């Protein structure tokens, strides 16, 4: 904790603070930051990052074709160093970019969208403990270098390599705090279920990063119920709120705290049981969609709009046996489930995953760390 003599304590030995400030101002004038200070990078420090991975520094990891811009291993390392990563974090950053490259939306410009989406990373496996990734209390908050800087490394790459500056190529209407950094780890040790990455066929001993494109994180306060159905319906209500229904369907990642996970597991619910329950109950009455002008789809974009709009067309539910019941999810696999957070209160979250039409059965991509 800082004391009244913090200035003396903060002055690192044999460091020229004026030169550090000059370097930070230089990076700011070059627009190589996210608005926060960055770590000055030297060639020798950069080489520590590159030495930790067996990759050609000029290998292209990710391309946004319509911008004609490419991110190489070297550029990824530079931005990881700027973000404050330690060299041992770089294999995670590298795998994150590989996972992002498999996602269809970023390469098509979704990070430039008015919707204000952001990259979101989940890390599983032994690497969590090795580099100090937080999977417990304050999972979406500050205080952990690995979480903060790995997520930030991706965002700085977006800005510095692809030019996604706000008010320029990044046209987000409001954006999200996740645009600074969004990287969490699963609390595998306190989960009653198999870890997220083992659902993809990996061994528990593998370290894996999963990448999503997200729009928001919604709080679920359910501190008193011990009934799995009641708790699941709280998640359902957040998933199918009308404000979330920008397209015909949505997708979500349930980030469940250990206390809530135990409510489900004690009642004999598996992840698939919860997934199927949420899928079946994530519906809206058409009258509810009429009330907010979202009871039809756009011919051009397939976004939700009023049936009175000249560009409107019927949604999929119109051709079913129950045209007045509109599903928010296209398939149970539209719901991903993981356990993270502290085991001290019933406070979970729904992470809203960006979904286009037609929706993907699995709205995420992943890559093994160190592959």
Segments predicted by a language model, with ranges:
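Non-transmembrane, aqueous-exposed alpha-helical and coiled segments at domain scale
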Residues: 2-371
């Amino acid at each position: 904790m800082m004391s009244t003599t913090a200035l003396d304590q903060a002055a690192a030995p044999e460091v020229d603070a004026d030169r550090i400030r000059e370097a930070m101002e230089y990076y700011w004038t070059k627009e190589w930051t996210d608005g926060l200070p960055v770590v000055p990078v030297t060639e020798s420090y950069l080489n520590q990052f590159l030495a930790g991975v067996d990759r050609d520094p000029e290998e292209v990891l990710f391309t946004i074709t319509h911008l004609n811009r490419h991110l190489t291993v070297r550029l990824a390392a530079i931005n990881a160093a700027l973000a404050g990563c330690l060299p041992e974090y770089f294999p995670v950053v590298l795998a994150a970019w590989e996972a992002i490259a498999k996602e269809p939306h970023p390469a098509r410009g979704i990070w430039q969208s008015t919707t204000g989406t952001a990259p979101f990373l989940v890390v599983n496996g032994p690497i969590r403990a090795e580099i100090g990734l937080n999977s417990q209390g304050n999972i979406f908050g500050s205080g952990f270098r690995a979480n903060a800087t790995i997520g930030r490394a991706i965002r700085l790459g977006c800005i510095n390599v692809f030019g996604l500056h706000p008010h320029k190529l990044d046209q987000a209407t409001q954006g999200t705090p996740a645009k600074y950094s969004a990287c969490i780890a699963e609390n595998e040790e306190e989960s009653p279920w198999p870890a997220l990455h083992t659902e993809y066929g990996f061994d528990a001993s593998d370290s894996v990063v999963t990448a999503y494109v997200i729009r928001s994180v919604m709080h679920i306060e359910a501190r008193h119920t011990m009934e799995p159905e009641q708790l699941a319906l709280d998640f359902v209500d957040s998933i199918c709120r009308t404000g979330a229904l920008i397209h015909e369907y949505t997708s979500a990642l349930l980030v469940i705290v250990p206390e809530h996970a135990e409510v489900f597991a004690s009642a004999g619910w598996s992840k698939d049981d919860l997934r199927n329950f949420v899928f079946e109950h994530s519906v809206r009455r058409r009258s509810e969609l009429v009330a907010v002008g979202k009871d039809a789809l756009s011919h051009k974009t397939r976004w939700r709009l009023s049936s009175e709009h000249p560009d409107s067309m019927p949604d999929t539910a119109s051709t079913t046996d129950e045209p007045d019941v509109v599903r928010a999810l296209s398939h149970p696999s539209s719901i991903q489930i993981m356990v993270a957070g502290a085991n001290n209160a019933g406070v979970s979250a729904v992470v809203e995953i960006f979904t286009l039409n037609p929706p993907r059965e699995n709205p995420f991509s992943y890559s093994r760390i160190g592959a």
